[in-house]
Amino acid sequence: MTSRTAYLAAPLVMVLLLPVVGLFVSPSAADIVAGAKHPLFAPALWLSLQTSVLSLGLIVVMGAPLAWWLANSSSASARVVELVVNLPIVIPPAVIGVGLLEVFGRRGLLGPWLESVGLSVPFSSAAVVIAQVVVAAPFFVQAGANAFRKIDDDLMVVARTLGESGPGAFLRVALPIALPGLIAGASIAWARALGEFGATLLFAGNMTGETQTMPLAIYTALESDVRAAVVMSMLLAAVGVLLLVALRFAPMAWKWTRDLGGLS
């Protein structure tokens, strides 16, 4: 990188970095302790962990087969499905929240039927999970499809020739090769679910202990106690930074582990 290019890039790098630096530099130790004791902190943290882990589990279970199919199909329908999967990336989360209300709300597409069997989805913990799945799933599916596309087809053919069934070849050949990409996609999807705000607010509401996740608690705390909002923001930022660092070094660790396994 030339000095001129560095000067041009520096302002953008600073704009991206300063908000994160500000979170960790501005508050004092007393502010952090006081913020962590705020009544919104613990319930929001626990709910966020519960819902985001459940969302991630659903995304992985449903998304891995979809990613495999997208990677191995060249049909027009696969390309259409891939476009649909990526829609939540480009559609604003608030719009997704309104759309979910139009599907699951009392007057929505499924609302009357759900109400007839005694189910109400909006403004519940289930709505939090649904919102997180919708906004986060594309990141896992896309990463998984890219990982599966890198697998040499000849390896699968050899596995089948040696007597492996289709599922067996997938589990013993394809999955280990694609695992680093799947883990990276799952990490990004989990971080996205953990930080989801707009769709959750509109579809699930902002009820303490029931639908108020960490981002919503930050929004609420800003009106009464900025210290609590800063502490919760620090926690989410720290999770993001740690995930990025882990993803940066995960490929090297994976290669090192496989090399050790080959030597043993």
Language-model segments: what does each one mean?
Residues 207-221:
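Short hydrophobic, aromatic-rich alpha-helical segments embedded in or entering the lipid bilayer
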Residues 1-30, 39-149, 173, 177-198, ...:
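Membrane-water interface segments at the C-terminal ends of transmembrane alpha-helices
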Residues 159:
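The alpha-helix within a helix-turn-helix
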Residues 151-155, 260:
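Short glycine/proline-centered loop/turn elements that form peptide/ligand docking sites
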Residues 76, 164-166:
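Short coil/turn motifs that cap or connect alpha-helices
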Residues 162-164, 176:
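Glycine/proline-centered hinge or cleavage motifs at structural transition points of membrane proteins
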